[in-house]
Amino acid sequence: MKIAMVTWEYPPRIVGGLAIHCKGLAEGLVRNGHEVDVITVGYDLPEYENINGVNVYRVRPISHPHFLTWAMFMAEEMEKKLGILGVDKYDVIHCHDWMTHFVGANLKHICRMPYVQSIHSTEIGRCGGLYSDDSKAIHAMEYLSTYESCQVITVSKSLKEEVCSIFNTPEDKVKVIYNGINPWEFDINLSWEEKINFRRSIGVQDDEKMILFVGRLTYQKGIEYLIRAMPKILERHNAKLVIAGSGDMRDYLEDLCYQLGVRHKVVFLGFVNGDTLKKLYKSADVVVIPSVYEPFGIVALEAMAAGTPVVVSSVGGLMEIIKHEVNGIWVYPKNPDSIAWGVDRVLSDWGFREYIVNNAKKDVYEKYSWDNIAKETVNVYKIAMEMMGR
C-alpha cells in the first residue's frame, strides 16, 4: 500500500507528541511492507530525506504572525507538494490534526482520494472551552475534519466519546487505535554510577529522590498542581522535581516556586529529547503526569518502558493505560494533596514500586508496539478505500 501521511510536525522538528506518534506509525507501516511518504514542514531542514525507510518531504510555507493564517499557507504548500509527487499514486491520505484537514478534504473531492483523519485532541479539551475567535475557528475546522473524512481515528476511547459528543460524529465512523512506542528505545542500560553522575549533572543530589515531569508547560498538562504538591511531598521526602519541557507558563511556574518556597527544589531543564530524555526516565524515582486533559499520554508509556513508576491524573486516556495500584497510581486531577499522596505511595514502599514497575513493563511490551498499531491502522485505510471505490 502507498500512503501519504500529512502532519505539521515530524522529527527532528518536534513541537509535541504528534511528531513522535507520526514517526512511530510511519516506520511501523514501513516495517509491515508499506510505502510511506510524509509531507511535513521544515524550514531549515532538507526538502527530502529518507529516514528509516520513510520518505520525508518538507515544505516551507510563507511565515505569518497569525498562526491560523500560517496554517492555511502550510496546507496550500502541502497540497502543491502532493500534486508534484503525483496524487494518483497513493492509495490513501492520512492527515493528523485540524491544520492539515484541508489537504485531505480537497484531495478527496478533487481526486476521490480515500481520506483518513487522526484527531489527537480537541480545542475544547485543550483549552477547557472556546474563549477566542481563533479557538472557535479551530473548533470549526476540527468539525469539518470529522465530517469530510472517510474514517476518523482517535488515540483513546475517552477521546472517541469526546469527538462523537462534541461533533455529533457517528460512532461507527470513529476507530480507536492507541498510541505506541518502541519500548526497547527507552529500556536502556544505565549503571548505578552512570545514573548518579547524570543526576548530579542536572542538579539532583545523591540523597534526593528525583521526581520527573515531561511535557509542555501548559494548563492542559497540569504542571502547576505538581509544583503546588511539592511542599507536602517535602514534608516526608528529601526530593527534587525535575521539569523537562518548555511553554508559555515557564515564568509563571518559576514565580510560583518562589512563592511556595520550593524554588531550590525544582529544576527547569527546558525542552529535552533523544538520549537525555531516555536518561531522565531511567534515572528518575517516579514520573508524574498531572494532566488536566490528556487524550492518551505517551509519556506514561515511555516511563513504563524505562522501568520507572508512574503517578497519573485520573483523566482521559491515562485511565485506559494505567490500572490503579496494578501498573501505576491514579490521583485526582488539579489536586495537589492527592498528587503528594501518590508520590509518597511510590517512594515509601519499595516492594510495591517493584510490583507496579514489573506489571507496567510487561504491558508496554505486549500492548503498545508500533508494528501492531500499524496493522490496525491499515485496516482503517482499507475501510476508507472501500468507501471511495478503490
From Swiss-Prot:
InterPro entries: Glyco_trans_1 (IPR001296), Glyco_trans_4-like_N (IPR028098), Glycosyltransferase_grp1 (IPR050194)
The keyword Transferase belongs to this UniProt entry's keyword annotation: yes
GO MF annotation list: glycosyltransferase activity
Pfam families xrefs: Glyco_transf_4 (PF13439), Glycos_transf_1 (PF00534)
Keyword set includes Protein biosynthesis: no
Record's keyword terms, sorted: Glycosyltransferase, Transferase
EC number: 2.4.-.-
Family annotation (SUPFAM superfamilies): UDP-Glycosyltransferase/glycogen phosphorylase
Sequence similarity: Belongs to the glycosyltransferase group 1 family. Glycosyltransferase 4 subfamily.
Protein name: Uncharacterized glycosyltransferase MJ1607
